[in-house]
């Protein structure tokens, strides 16, 4: 049976990658067409995130709004991702109109699960962890523009006390080296110029190679950089403990590795880091940052921060602010701590008033935003290498792209430049983007 599928995504880049694969597997195996509105779809899928409590509640709000599509149109409603993995049957109990519940490791089984739900008239739940089977069953890679995500591993084995990822995505499993290279090469042939290598703990990648050896992330980056057409490489998300000497050296040796790094620290307090079971101190984190900056002068460093963790004192928070100033973090993500069921941190006592936590979060965000503004302002007058990825959202008569440090630049130029690296002189720093003047094609542009 053919039909139309709509996919909505909550959460991280890994979820965006998985959502594309959900649609692709239905397109390939059942002839579906992907649509942009749930009202036009025969199958409506929600790919969920369980990192934050509010994100989890958004799932059931969304499902409530979708109930009418099932009643009026007979649409099949499916829930995937980390909330599905965590809640399983409980989703159907709370939202009985849901037909299919599947985890991150079972999205490749979607066609069969949808068939079973339709034929049997009852909900189908499969949130098992069939190890590498997901990667073995992925559809052929399909490019949608000059940038692409490629998942190289799944899961996390760090078990930080606040985090649900090991429980929702399982232990770390690395995708075979040859499979990763084949996917990137295929995407490059389709016009992809920048690839982001994905994993919950991506620098723990240990991909088996055909000769029996193991490839780490640093070596993988060198192989990806050697592929025709690839002009820029990013990776996310990293853990400081796994940030190896060879990966630091990759920043010195490989010019195609973008000068921008997202390396979550969560806190600058050694006490809080210990409670979080992060496995490192603030000084050890700072030492790695200094070595990375020495290997790649001018690199932009972004991070994640949790404010109001149980037991965090004002002194602990001040330690975090000092680390932020020492590193000079660029645009980063920061949240109030949200206890997740089943994690060790959920049982910790917490006596800090909510208004104190909110005030700390505001101070932290103001500090980081001020750093980010200074970085943007320092770029005015410089010439940046920009990958043009589409028309400008602000002005359809202009084009836009991203710099190495991940800033959006809008500038006048012909749409035929989409998919090309160009040189742009930055003329203005705006709150959420830059403006620039096109100078020409980049001399070192990857073959297009």
Swiss-Prot record:
<comment type="subunit">
    <text>Monomer.</text>
</comment>
<feature type="binding site">
    <location>
        <position position="49"/>
    </location>
    <ligand>
        <name>[4Fe-4S] cluster 1</name>
    </ligand>
</feature>
<dbReference type="GO" id="GO:0051539">
    <property type="term" value="F:4 iron, 4 sulfur cluster binding"/>
</dbReference>
<dbReference type="Pfam" id="PF04055">
    <property type="entry name" value="Radical_SAM"/>
</dbReference>
<dbReference type="InterPro" id="IPR002792">
    <property type="entry name" value="TRAM_dom"/>
</dbReference>
<dbReference type="GO" id="GO:0046872">
    <property type="term" value="F:metal ion binding"/>
</dbReference>
<feature type="domain" description="TRAM">
    <location>
        <begin position="377"/>
        <end position="440"/>
    </location>
</feature>
<protein>
    <recommendedName>
        <fullName>tRNA-2-methylthio-N(6)-dimethylallyladenosine synthase</fullName>
        <ecNumber>2.8.4.3</ecNumber>
    </recommendedName>
</protein>
<dbReference type="InterPro" id="IPR005839">
    <property type="entry name" value="Methylthiotransferase"/>
</dbReference>
<keyword id="KW-0808">Transferase</keyword>
<feature type="domain" description="Radical SAM core">
    <location>
        <begin position="142"/>
        <end position="374"/>
    </location>
</feature>
<keyword id="KW-0963">Cytoplasm</keyword>
<keyword id="KW-0819">tRNA processing</keyword>
<dbReference type="InterPro" id="IPR007197">
    <property type="entry name" value="rSAM"/>
</dbReference>
<dbReference type="InterPro" id="IPR006638">
    <property type="entry name" value="Elp3/MiaA/NifB-like_rSAM"/>
</dbReference>
<comment type="function">
    <text>Catalyzes the methylthiolation of N6-(dimethylallyl)adenosine (i(6)A), leading to the formation of 2-methylthio-N6-(dimethylallyl)adenosine (ms(2)i(6)A) at position 37 in tRNAs that read codons beginning with uridine.</text>
</comment>
<dbReference type="InterPro" id="IPR038135">
    <property type="entry name" value="Methylthiotransferase_N_sf"/>
</dbReference>
<comment type="similarity">
    <text>Belongs to the methylthiotransferase family. MiaB subfamily.</text>
</comment>
<feature type="binding site">
    <location>
        <position position="12"/>
    </location>
    <ligand>
        <name>[4Fe-4S] cluster 1</name>
    </ligand>
</feature>
<dbReference type="Pfam" id="PF00919">
    <property type="entry name" value="UPF0004"/>
</dbReference>
<feature type="domain" description="MTTase N-terminal">
    <location>
        <begin position="3"/>
        <end position="119"/>
    </location>
</feature>
<dbReference type="GO" id="GO:0005829">
    <property type="term" value="C:cytosol"/>
</dbReference>
<dbReference type="GO" id="GO:0035597">
    <property type="term" value="F:N6-isopentenyladenosine methylthiotransferase activity"/>
</dbReference>
<keyword id="KW-0004">4Fe-4S</keyword>
<feature type="binding site">
    <location>
        <position position="156"/>
    </location>
    <ligand>
        <name>[4Fe-4S] cluster 2</name>
    </ligand>
</feature>
<feature type="binding site">
    <location>
        <position position="163"/>
    </location>
    <ligand>
        <name>[4Fe-4S] cluster 2</name>
    </ligand>
</feature>
<dbReference type="InterPro" id="IPR023404">
    <property type="entry name" value="rSAM_horseshoe"/>
</dbReference>
<keyword id="KW-0408">Iron</keyword>
<dbReference type="InterPro" id="IPR013848">
    <property type="entry name" value="Methylthiotransferase_N"/>
</dbReference>
<keyword id="KW-0479">Metal-binding</keyword>
<keyword id="KW-0949">S-adenosyl-L-methionine</keyword>
<feature type="binding site">
    <location>
        <position position="160"/>
    </location>
    <ligand>
        <name>[4Fe-4S] cluster 2</name>
    </ligand>
</feature>
<dbReference type="InterPro" id="IPR020612">
    <property type="entry name" value="Methylthiotransferase_CS"/>
</dbReference>
<keyword id="KW-0411">Iron-sulfur</keyword>
<feature type="binding site">
    <location>
        <position position="82"/>
    </location>
    <ligand>
        <name>[4Fe-4S] cluster 1</name>
    </ligand>
</feature>
<dbReference type="Pfam" id="PF01938">
    <property type="entry name" value="TRAM"/>
</dbReference>
<dbReference type="InterPro" id="IPR006463">
    <property type="entry name" value="MiaB_methiolase"/>
</dbReference>
């Amino acid at each position: 049976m053919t039909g139309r599928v709509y996919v909505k995504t909550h959460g991280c880049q890994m979820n965006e990658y998985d959502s594309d694969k959900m649609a692709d597997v239905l397109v390939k195996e059942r002839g579906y067409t992907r649509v942009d509105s749930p009202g036009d779809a025969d199958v409506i899928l929600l790919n969920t995130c369980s990192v934050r409590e509010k994100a989890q509640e958004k799932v059931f709000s969304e499902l409530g709004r979708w109930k009418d599509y099932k009643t009026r149109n007979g649409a099949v409603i499916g829930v995937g991702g980390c909330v599905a993995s965590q809640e399983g049957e409980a989703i159907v109990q709370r939202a009985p109109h849901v037909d299919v519940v599947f985890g991150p490791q079972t999205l490749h089984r979607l066609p069969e699960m949808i068939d079973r739900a339709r034929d049997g008239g009852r909900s189908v739940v499969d949130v098992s962890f069939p190890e590498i089977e997901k990667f073995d069953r992925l559809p052929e890679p399909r490019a949608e523009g000059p940038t692409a995500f490629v998942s190289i591993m799944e899961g996390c084995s760090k078990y930080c006390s606040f985090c649900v990822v090991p429980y929702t995505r399982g232990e770390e499993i690395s995708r075979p080296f040859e499979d990763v290279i084949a996917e990137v090469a295929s995407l490059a042939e389709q016009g992809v110029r920048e690839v982001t290598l994905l994993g919950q703990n991506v620098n723990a990648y240990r991909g088996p190679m055909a000769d029996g050896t193991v490839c780490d992330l640093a070596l993988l980056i060198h192989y990806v950089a050697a592929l025709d057409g690839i002009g820029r490489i990013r990776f996310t998300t990293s853990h400081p403990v796994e940030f190896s000497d060879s990966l630091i050296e990759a920043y010195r040796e490989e010019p195609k590795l973008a000068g921008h790094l997202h390396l979550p620290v969560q806190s600058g307090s050694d006490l809080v880091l210990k409670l979080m079971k992060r496995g490192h101190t603030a000084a050890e984190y700072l030492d790695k940052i200094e070595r990375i900056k020495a290997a790649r002068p001018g690199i932009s460093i972004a991070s994640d921060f949790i404010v109001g963790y149980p037991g965090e004192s004002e002194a602990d928070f001040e330690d975090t602010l000092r680390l932020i100033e020492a590193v000079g973090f660029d645009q980063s993500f920061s949240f109030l701590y949200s206890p997740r069921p089943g994690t060790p941190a959920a049982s910790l006592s917490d006596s800090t008033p909510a208004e104190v936590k909110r005030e700390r979060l505001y101070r932290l965000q103001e500090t980081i935003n001020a750093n980010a503004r200074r970085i943007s302002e320092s770029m005015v007058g410089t010439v940046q290498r920009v990958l043009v990825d589409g028309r400008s959202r602000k002005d359809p008569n202009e084009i836009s792209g991203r710099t190495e440090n991940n800033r959006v630049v809008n500038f006048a130029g012909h749409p035929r430049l989409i998919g090309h690296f160009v040189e742009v002189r930055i003329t203005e720093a705006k709150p959420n983007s830059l403006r620039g003047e096109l100078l020409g094609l980049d001399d070192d542009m990857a073959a297009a």
